[in-house]
């Protein structure tokens, strides 16, 4: 998630993803910035906070984009998945979930792309997984893969795996790196700090 609002090329990124999925089987997850970009493209009045967190660059990038192209981008954003649960009980989502019984019971779909409490919980728990007080949310899935909350907040630009939650957001939306991870081996690759690419 968060294909939008990061830097100055949101329309080009969305065009690339739309074309790429025609050549390669893809599963795209919804991020909070994608949801916000959709609102902007639909004409909603956006607030200052959005503009300060990448929205200003998105507004500028869309100034000369045709209505037809904007519609294609809205359709693409509408097609994004909130989460993916694979056959090995590994959960992939942008941010987290809050329901103690898991994703199937989440009452507010926005939590999949706005929640930070899952990562905060994973970072704060020191109990062994076998302890009866170990948080249920961290026991439901074999592995959980998220982004949304940069690992740079914990002083590193590397992905972190804590209590079964792998966070691969290494701050690309700010001055960090873009990271991809092989979920089988946990090997990862990173870009240069993204701001150096512009």
Task: Please give the residue ranges for each predicted region.
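Divalent metal-coordination and catalytic microenvironments
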Residues: 2, 17, 31-32, 58, ...
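Conserved beta-sheet core of the metallophosphoesterase superfamily
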Residues: 128-194
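Catalytic phosphate/metal-binding cores of nucleic-acid and nucleotide-processing enzymes, i.e., regions
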Residues: 49, 65, 99-102, 134-137, ...
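Divalent-metal (often Zn2+) His-rich catalytic cores of metallo-beta-lactamase-fold enzymes
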Residues: 91-112
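Short, well-ordered beta-strand micro-motif
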Residues: 85-86, 92-94, 180-184
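Short, conserved active-site loop motifs that form the nucleotide-linked donor/cofactor pocket
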Residues: 26, 90, 165
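Active-site neighborhood of divalent metal-dependent phosphoester bond hydrolases
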Residues: 6-86, 105, 111-125
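Short, solvent-exposed loop/turn segments at secondary-structure junctions
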Residues: 34-35, 97-100, 150-152, 172-173
